Amino acid sequence: SRGLGDVYKRQHSGNCSIFLSGKVTEDIISRVTDTFGTSFGQHQQSASKLSFPFTAVPEKRIFIEREDAMQSAVKMGYTTITRNHPDYLKLRVLMTLFGGYFGSRLMSNIREEKGYTYGISAGIMFYPDSGLLAISTETDNEYVEPLIQEVYHEIDRLHQEPVSMEELTIVRNYMLGEMCRSYESPFSLSDAWIFIATSGLDDDYFSRSLLAVNEVTPAEIQDLAQRYLCKETLKEVIAGKKLS
């Protein structure tokens, strides 16, 4: 029985954590302890570190032919910083303004004004030790080229013109509202702390996020755009019907 107990400790509770949120009482803690035991999670396993290195292809554009496609999927992106980088929290504000919510620059121009797509987004995807800045959309085959040019146009605007305080305030209010929703219920609160634990972030991550959203300036947004939104290194991947 001792051997079975040792196997259980090593394989079933190693590298695990229990998160309790809401109205947590001593009785609840006692019941959880009785159910899982006092040694739950104490036998940490040394998991191998996973790495996902990116190797950029030399081509600026990759086209994947889909002869019968009515629309084309367009992806644009390149490698960028991770969440632990000092610039990341303010870069989040830039990416939200650029393509991270319904009123973003990309949505306002390419969807609302030009009508090239029903939706377009920009954000940062994360992998161990690396980040991927990605712009994603779908459009009619005939609009692929003008759509891509409008993406570059919006990047140029961010390089050349400081955003207005009015626009920055709208983005701030949106992001602060999203942050509030992350803590409004016991389930969302526990999800927030699970995110911290599994992403290897410090406990002050959310307070630093709040500070960054409130303090970032138009000049900083412009500087970040010039350093992290680079047309020359942006790769284009298109899957659809090639027009002659």
What are these regions (language model features)?
Residues 1, 103-104:
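Short linear Ser/Thr-Pro motifs
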Residues 44-103:
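His/Glu-based metal-binding/catalytic segments typifying zinc-dependent metallopeptidases
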